[in-house]
Curated annotation (Swiss-Prot):
UniProt induction comment: By touch, salt and hydrogen peroxide treatments, drought stress, wounding, dark and infection by the bacterial pathogen P.syringae.
Subunit structure, as described in the record: Binds to ABCG36.
Binding locations of Ca(2+) 1: 52, 54, 56, 58, 63
SMART domains: EFh
Protein's recorded name: Calcium-binding protein CML38
Superkingdom in the source lineage: Eukaryota
Signal peptide (residue range): none
Domain EF-hand: 39-74, 75-110, 111-146, 147-177
Stretches the record annotates as Disordered: 1-44
Length: 177
């Protein structure tokens, strides 16, 4: 069986393609990024509706696969079944709207965590697993900010919950909220 993260990545891509778009003041088309939960829910409903080809209120693995194909994305039988299984809480082998919403929410959280891990890696020195005053100083220098090691110690101490003088990934994630 294939990796379960693949269907989620594909889900996110599909949702982006199906989300309503708007024009900005320069006339370019951009994704609609509303922080309003109601707008986000309407967008999800539109995506769900598109995928629910037979309009029975549930998305089958086959409907999921066909939705991907119409947008030029490939999803194997196994990936479609795995994607549905990830959020199928009632065990009927299909996704209702609530289950679909949960799958998208999980994907959003995983994507944010991966982005944070990527940013965290930029700030750590090779062979380290935390941000040290020295590694922070080097990264800030690359970004055009000249700081002393003592300045960096002070910056780290503001988010250093366990007072060990460095930032772990969890402390970094808290800082980035």
């Amino acid at each position: 069986m294939k990796n379960n993260t693949q269907p989620q990545s594909s889900f996110k891509k599909l949702c982006r393609k199906l989300s309503p778009k708007r024009e900005d003041s320069a006339g370019e088309i951009q994704q609609h990024n509303s922080s309003n939960g109601e707008d986000k829910n309407r967008e999800l409903e539109a995506v769900f509706s598109y995928m629910d080809a037979n309009r029975d209120g549930r998305i089958s693995p086959e409907e999921l696969q066909k939705s991907f194909m119409t947008l030029g994305e490939q999803l194997s039988d196994e990936e479609a079944v795995a994607a549905v299984r990830l959020s199928d809480t009632d065990g009927d082998g299909m996704l209702d709207f609530e289950e679909f919403s949960q799958l998208i929410k999980v994907d959003d959280e995983e994507e944010k965590k991966m982005e944070l891990k990527g940013a965290f890696r930029l700030y750590i020195a090779e062979g380290e697993d935390c941000i040290t005053p020295r590694s922070l100083k080097m990264m800030l220098k690359k970004l055009g900010e000249s700081r002393t090691t003592d300045d960096c110690r002070v910056m780290i101490s503001a988010f250093d919950l366990n007072a060990d003088g460095v930032l772990s990934f969890d402390e970094f994630a808290l800082m980035m909220r």
